[in-house]
Amino acid sequence: MKKVIIMAALLISCIFYAQEVQPKYEVVGNEVKATYFHDNGQVKQEGNYLSGKLQGKWISYNENGNKVAIGEYNNGVKVGKWFFWTDDTLNEVDYTGNRVADVRKWSKEALVKN
């Protein structure tokens, strides 16, 4: 009976381990493109590394695949304009030297539709 329980526990742990979504890394030129995933398999985050530091555009998504953040890194430091989406709000955050320099918020109703 002990052997059956041990085998069942081992089998279950193997099944759960196999279902874990592992990050994907791909060498592109002198950078490494990284893609991270939510438990449901949807892309969570994607961007590049250069010399082990975050570099260039990074995009984050929620579990449903909707974009929730986009911004730029330079040598591991947040730079320029970053955009963060929540339910009804778009936040624009300006970074200078990895520090927040300015924040602007727009509600869904304030955005112009064409």
Predicted regions and their residues:
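Positively charged n-region of N-terminal signal peptides that target proteins for export
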Residues: 1-4, 19
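Glycine/tyrosine- and acidic-biased, solvent-exposed loop/turn segments at the edges of beta-strands
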Residues: 14-114
